[in-house]
Regions:
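Active-site cofactor/cluster-binding pocket
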Residues: 139-194
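Residue-level recognition of beta-strand->loop/alpha-helix junctions
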Residues: 7, 38, 114-115
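Positively charged, low-complexity intrinsically disordered leader regions
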Residues: 46-77
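Anionic-ligand anchoring segments at beta-strand to alpha-helix junctions in alpha/beta enzyme folds, i.e.
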Residues: 77, 81-152
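A structured phosphate/pyrophosphate-recognition subdomain
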Residues: 64-67, 74-88, 95-108, 189-257
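Catalytic/regulatory signature loops of cyclic-dinucleotide turnover enzymes
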Residues: 2-4, 17-46
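Alpha-helical/coil-rich non-catalytic "connector" segments in signaling and regulatory proteins
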Residues: 1-2, 6-7, 157
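Fold-independent oxyanion-binding glycine-rich loops
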Residues: 85-86, 116, 159-162, 182-185, ...
């Protein structure tokens, strides 16, 4: 059972809208909790409950619907920029390359934003290995280069995080009007104002698990994930599940296989 409670709005309609938003927040955080927030933009929400173990609440129908929705958004965008959190781990990197492949399925250029000054050792080793794959390496650009290339109708996809302050480049984030979020962390207070689509599933082991499911609904004989991309996404799942010892469900094993 989840509840969203709001109070103090100037109108009943605004208070009701805030209450619905609070309920949505409770659900994307995993459910079994109550979210209370005053109907003011600057107000901070209060969270009660949510202590139970997260169970698998998403369905294949929802995953397919999300895949088709993202496909439509990509088709309406000039190009795609993909950004993870600061000091990205393998899940952020793997899911970013997965989204880039989704963009290529739909004949759109995709760029993965990385800051060379914020690279952890595991990711650094992968970036060395990726030099053997020019098509993949050329997708990686700096925040500064991304700001030069961005067009008015460009799309930003946030992977493995949803708090703008955790962006590799918050300045770059603020340049985008079109934003999509793919994340597996419980939704917090800080959140983009008006994302085009928010796919947050706290029951998933990782962002790579979610992106793999999205790819499954768009791949065919002509559109396939490359072996190195699949390896990066599997590494993201392995890291976030501590080698399948935590936050692992039947769907995690299904995706990994």
């Amino acid at each position: 059972l989840s509840m969203g409670i709001a109070y103090g709005g100037p109108t009943l309609d605004q208070t009701g809208t805030t209450a619905q938003t609070n309920l949505d927040t409770a659900l994307v955080r995993g459910g079994d909790q109550v979210v209370v927030k005053e109907a003011k933009d600057e107000a901070k929400p209060l969270f009660f409950g949510g202590k139970t173990a997260v169970t698998t609440k998403r369905s294949q129908v929802r995953s397919r619907a999300m895949s088709m929705a993202i496909k439509g958004i990509i088709a309406e965008s000039a190009d795609i920029y993909i950004m993870g959190h600061r000091y990205p781990d393998m899940d952020a990197l793997g899911s970013a390359f997965g989204v880039a492949r989704l963009a290529s399925f739909n004949n759109r250029k995709a760029w993965i934003v990385l800051d060379e000054n914020e690279i952890i050792p595991d990711v650094k080793r992968v970036l060395e290995a990726i030099k053997e794959y020019p098509e993949l390496e050329e997708r990686i650009i700096s925040p500064k280069e991304a700001m030069k290339r961005k067009k008015e109708s460009s799309l930003l996809v946030m992977v493995d995080y949803h708090k703008p302050s955790l962006s590799i480049s918050q300045e770059l984030y603020e340049r985008f009007d079109k934003v999509v979020i793919i994340d597996h962390h419980r939704r917090g207070d800080e959140f983009p104002a008006k994302p085009l689509l928010s796919y947050i599933e706290s029951s998933a082991s990782s962002a790579s698990e979610l992106v793999t499911e999205l790819i499954e609904y768009q791949s065919n004989s002509a559109n396939k994930l490359q072996a190195f991309e699949a390896t990066m996404m599997l590494a993201g799942i392995v890291v976030d599940t501590k080698s399948f010892n935590t936050r692992t469900t039947a769907r995690t094993f299904d995706v990994a296989s």
